[in-house]
Regions:
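Conserved HGGG/HGGXW glycine-rich cap/lid loop of the alpha/beta-hydrolase fold
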Residues: 26-82
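Conserved alpha/beta-hydrolase catalytic His-Asp/Glu region
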Residues: 147-152, 165-227
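Flexible "cap/lid" loop of the alpha/beta hydrolase fold
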Residues: 123, 127, 133-164
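Catalytic active-site module of serine/aspartate enzymes centered on a nucleophile-bearing elbow/loop
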Residues: 257-299
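Conserved loop-alpha-helix segment in the C-terminal half of the alpha/beta-hydrolase fold
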Residues: 230-266, 272
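Alpha/beta-hydrolase fold catalytic core
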Residues: 1-42, 64-67, 107, 134, ...
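Active-site loop/oxyanion-hole signature of alpha/beta-hydrolase fold enzymes
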Residues: 10, 20-21, 64, 70-113, ...
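Short beta-to-alpha linker loops that shape the active-site pocket of alpha/beta-hydrolase fold enzymes
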Residues: 73-78, 142, 266-267
Length: 299
């Protein structure tokens, strides 16, 4: 979760439900700035306990660089529908197919950006079919399972969800402090937004948290598979990360032959810790990616 989520989108952005072959998904769709040449479209996937609002502070600086940005709530996240208690609906393969349906509904090839858990879902989508995508950026998202310390926090959360209501669990999270992958009500931007963080938590389906929390603790290393995919890769993180230590992300970037960016002064959520620097690094990468024609699906 990005703890500094901003719930007020830019003035020109549209919040709506994106209709896809796999259902509707809540999105914030922010256009290219007036007078700026359009360069491409970006599909943004949030992390565990997060939502599309985690990318709010990136929309305007990326629009100024020529990029339309579409941030999405995945199945069962915040304002997107999903089963309340059936974890099977949140299997990683199902979430990956949702991403392919989302990009198809946008009607154009897109740069894919996944934060944390969203990066692992993005990786799974690209491994199913890379052809709808122009590039893949993994933001604070590592090669395999999360660190032992974060696994322990996620287990605490999953245990609490087995016996408590979402509202009761939220109160426990406040008492726990701000773990990177559990998500606490840390500062939000603007009056009333801490309460909106609570509303986001209450809108998230318990089964989504249980299933994806388990995925974070068991995800295998699929970097070798990903490296065989013919896409440009970008590994971006803050200067400190307890979920996937920075040296692990450095090594993953080498294995992927990826561009590597470390955002000074940022931790697990550079998108909210240092949005201007993060947007600049993202746009610099995308500016250098050639737009190739659609090729045959990856097998």
């Amino acid at each position: 979760m990005s703890s500094n989520a901003a719930f007020t989108p830019p003035p020109d952005a549209r919040a709506y439900r994106l209709r896809t072959a796999r259902g509707e998904f809540a999105v914030v769709d922010s256009p290219v700035a007036d007078g700026v040449e359009a360069k491409g479209t970006v599909l943004m996937l949030p992390g565990f306990t997060g939502s599309k609002e985690d990318f709010t502070l990136l929309h305007e600086p990326l629009g100024a660089r020529g990029y339309r940005t579409v941030a999405v709530d995945g199945r069962g996240q915040y304002e997107s529908d999903g089963p309340e208690h059936d974890e099977a609906g949140y299997a990683q393969a199902e979430l990956a197919r949702d991403v392919l349906a989302q990009v198809a509904a946008l009607g154009t090839r897109a740069h894919l950006l996944g934060h944390s858990l969203g990066g692992q879902i993005a990786r799974a989508a690209v491994l199913l079919d890379h052809t709808p995508f122009v590039s893949l950026t993994l933001m604070s998202s590592g090669p395999a399972r999360i660190s032992v310390s974060q696994q322990q926090r996620v287990k605490l959360l999953r245990d609490a969800l087995d016996t408590m209501t979402m509202a009761e669990v939220w109160d426990v999270i406040q008492a726990m402090g701000p773990p990177e992958e559990v998500g606490a009500p840390a500062p939000a931007h603007g009056p009333g937004e801490p309460e909106r963080l609570r509303g986001r938590w209450l809108g998230t389906r318990p089964a989504q948290l249980l299933a994806t929390g388990r995925q974070l603790c068991t995800e295998p290393d699929r970097v070798g598979e990903l490296a065989a995919v013919p896409l440009p890769f970008h590994v971006l993180s803050g200067a400190y990360d307890d979920t996937w230590p920075v040296p692990l992300l450095d090594e993953m970037a080498v294995r992927l032959d990826a561009r590597r960016t470390v955002i000074a002064g940022a931790e697990h959520s550079p998108n909210t810790d240092r949005p201007e620097a993060t947007a600049r690094a993202l746009a610099d990468f995308w500016d250098g990616v050639p737009i190739r024609p659609r090729s045959a699906p990856h097998q």
